[in-house]
Amino acid sequence: LEEGLPSLGLRVRTGHWGIAGEPPVLLVDFKPLWQEKDTLYFELWKAYALESDKGYGDYDESSLFAIAAARLMESIAAWRSEERTIAIFNEWQTAMGLLYLRQHAPQIRTLFITHATTVGRSIAGNDKDLYTYMDAYDGDQMARELGVEAKHQVEKLAAHEASVFATVSKLTAREAKQLLGREPIVLPNGFHVGTSPLTAPMLSKRKKARQLLGAVASRLYGQTIDPKQAFFISLGGRYEYRNKGIDLFIESLHHFAESYQGERDVVAFLLVPAWEAGPRADLQYLLTHPQEEQSNPLQYPMLSHWLYNTEHDRAVCHIRHRGLDRADSRVKVIFVPCYLNGLDGVLDLSYYDLLVGMDLTIYPSYYEPWGYTPLESIRYGVPTITTTLAGFGLWAEEEQMTKPFASAPHRPVHVVERTDTNIPETIEMISSLIARQLSLSLEEQKEQRKKAYELARCADWKLFYRHYEAAYEQMK
């Protein structure tokens, strides 16, 4: 394979991915294709009337990478011509590669998976009502209105040209059919579940995470927050304020704080990468000098890292507006605006190593085709709140009606009904669920964490891969 690659005019590295199974991997440098860009785009315009001249931002880089990957696939298929070849393309970013194969290697069977539609995400992200008017939306017209014509067009073409078209949930299947004009099959997202969170090593990780979370909260707010007594909540994900439910996360905490009379500190962590300017030196110093006395909260106690746009950041403004940065309140919010890769300079733990220390996660999403974050949460034994507008939420709601979850007194996944218009009711429900979780005994919490892990195992790739096998059968 390596001997034949130079003729492609692309720089390629071969190796193995360092995960279980060590699958072979090809890394391709697509930069040489920049000089061919106009020719490649013209070829696809002739074949499909694809208007790539309307693309902007990451359109060109995504498209050229997709074509480079498709050329590698074409080469591999020719090398192993006696075998049936299947090429899988995910999202609009790789869609042009599928179109390239249709022109240059039509014998390769293709699967196109959209994990969200370009137009659907844009409608939701622009504060328009996606679900009330879903059956009336025209994908092409909305793409023009929202300025995403090229991305939508290549995505729609791939959906129609693919041997099999798929998406990740029933929720998004309806959206894809309406906006892209072809009904997809559903391939739900699985997860490698791994070790139980109730084993000794995982419990040790949980203890370490809680000690760190307590220390950070204590230093930011200038008071002792005992990790053994505190109740830790988190939301993680992309900084899509409405789509990911960050707005409702803060509003629900505010609503809860207004009536909370308990003695336990409730600390909510917003784990969302933003325009981070680096770790706080004052916080770093205090964390590394535990004997240093402190009588007052730090400036901007809701921030673990500095931001370039602190005064204008939407989450910071919202937190301050709702008084969730007050040291005298039992309910506090801490915004962690960095990528949690274990090297952020303050927490220095990965996202998963922090997640295991939480008592509850909240993902009140408005637009969530699947929703890995609540699935990741229960994999680590942390109960979660999600909504009926998340594909995972609908799956979990259905799964929890079966044994052994139907009889469980405290379900690990709370699925809150959310629509375009019921925001006050959603906030009220999330607030009451926080209170309910706080009231559980240690034994009830332990049983709920156990059920959370058991539910996560129902979404293991070992079980969900059968959906892919069924898709491959359709390609014969």
Features from the language model and the residues they span:
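Catalytic cores of nucleotide-sugar-dependent glycosyltransferases that transfer UDP/GDP/TDP-activated
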Residues: 1-476
